[in-house]
Amino acid sequence: MLIAITGGIGMGKSTILSQFQGLGAKTLDADDVAHDMYLPNRPAYTTLLQHWGNGILAQDGTLDRKKIAGIVFQSKEELAWLNSVMHPLVRNAIQDCANEDARPLFCAIPLLFESGWEETADKIISVWCDRETQMQRLIARGWSREHAKDRLDSQWSPERKLLLADYAIVSGCSWQHLADQCRIVYQAIVASITQSL
C-alpha cells in the first residue's frame, strides 16, 4: 500500500515524513530515490551524461543537480526529457519498496499530481503552509526570492493539491501542533487499513 505525501517545495514534507517514521511507519522520499539515480553506475547516470555531456558533472564525478536544474528550468523541452527518463525509474523504485512487505509505505512525492502518479497512491496526504512561510523556507536554503518564485510558479498550487487529497496537514504551525496532526492522520490511515482487512 502506498501513502503519498505531496506538496510544493518548502512545504515541510521531509519533516512530516520524519514524524511518520517516528510513529513507526515505513518511509521513503522520492527525491532521495531520484538523487540516488544520479550516482555513477545507476541507470540515469549514463543516460543523462550521454544527453548533456561532461558539463553536468560535479568534481567528484557525480551528476551535479544544480547544473541540471539550470538546464531544465530554462527549457520546457529539456525538463520534459529529464522527466521522461527519471519518472519511470523513480516510480519503479517506489513500487518495489512498497511491495517489499505488507506494511504501508509513506512516501514523499513532491510532484505526485504534476507527474500523473496520483492513481498509484492508495491514500494521499497534502501538506500546506502559506506562501510567505514557504518562500522564507526557500530563502533560508540560500535561494533568491526570484528563483524561489520561479520554482513555486512551475508547480501546482498547494490549494489545488489539497482539493485532491484524502488528508491535509498544515505545516506552518508549532512543532507540537504538527506532531499532533501527523499522529492523528497516521492513526486514521492505520485504522482504515485495519478495517479493510
Task: Map each language-model feature to its residues.
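Small-molecule kinase domains that catalyze NTP-dependent phosphoryl transfer to phosphate-bearing small molecules
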Residues: A93-I94, E119-T120, Q136, W143-V190, ...
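The conserved Walker
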Residues: I9
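Hydrophobic anchor at the beta1->P-loop junction of P-loop NTPases
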Residues: I5
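ATP-dependent small-molecule kinase phosphotransfer cores
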Residues: D32-R103
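Residue-level signal for inorganic ion chemistry
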Residues: D31, L82, F106, A148, ...
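ATP-dependent NMP and nucleoside kinases share a basic, alpha-helical "lid"
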Residues: N92-N99, P104-A140
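Walker A/P-loop
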Residues: S14
